[in-house]
């Protein structure tokens, strides 16, 4: 594989992640965040994608100290957006997993709708062939991130 093109692709991927995140946070209607912070919304999104997760793993995903996650979880628990699930392997509190509640999923539906509405004008004029390519590339990357077959 051409090293220069690979470097260009990786740099573009990182830039799209950063610029896309900034764009979405700037464009999303503030009403979506009237009850929770952006960091709490990101935590809910992680739980939706990953399923029941330990606080330590959540800290790793958000690249913050466990105390920051504890504070976020406390607020989300008080609002009924997450709940503790017992880990089947162990019985102490340290082994409990946090899970999203139906109320938390409802907040995420509002957030997903706001993200869609913010990004739609940017993507709406991309032709079908390029859109198919984007979906195909993201599907391959997602599979590779999860340790799947590279030839999918």
From Swiss-Prot:
DNA-binding region: 55-78
Name listed for the protein in its UniProt record: Uncharacterized HTH-type transcriptional regulator YdgG
Organism of derivation: Bacillus subtilis (strain 168)
Domain HTH marR-type: 3-143
Keywords attached to this entry: DNA-binding, Transcription, Transcription regulation
InterPro entries: HTH_MarR-typ, MarR/SlyA-like, WH-like_DNA-bd_sf, WH_DNA-bd_sf
Molecular function in Gene Ontology: DNA binding; DNA-binding transcription factor activity
Matching Pfam families: MarR
PANTHER family: TRANSCRIPTIONAL REGULATOR, MARR FAMILY (PTHR33164), TRANSCRIPTIONAL REGULATORY PROTEIN (PTHR33164:SF102)
Gene3D superfamilies for the chain: Winged helix-like DNA-binding domain superfamily/Winged helix DNA-binding domain
GO BP of this protein: regulation of DNA-templated transcription; response to stress
């Amino acid at each position: 594989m051409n090293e220069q093109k690979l470097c260009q692709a990786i740099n573009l991927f990182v830039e799209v992640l950063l610029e896309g995140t900034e764009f979405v946070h700037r464009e999303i209607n503030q009403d979506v965040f009237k009850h929770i912070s952006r960091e709490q919304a990101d935590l809910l999104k992680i739980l939706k994608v990953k399923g029941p997760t330990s606080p330590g793993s959540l800290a790793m995903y958000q690249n913050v100290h466990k105390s920051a996650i504890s504070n976020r979880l406390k607020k989300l628990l008080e609002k009924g957006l997450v709940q503790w699930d017992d880990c089947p392997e162990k019985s102490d509190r340290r082994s409990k997993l946090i899970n999203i509640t139906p109320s938390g999923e409802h907040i995420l539906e509002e957030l997903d709708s706001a993200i869609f509405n913010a990004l739609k004008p940017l993507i709406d004029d991309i032709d079908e062939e390029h859109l198919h390519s984007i979906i195909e590339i993201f599907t391959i990357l997602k599979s590779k991130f999860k340790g799947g077959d590279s030839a999918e």
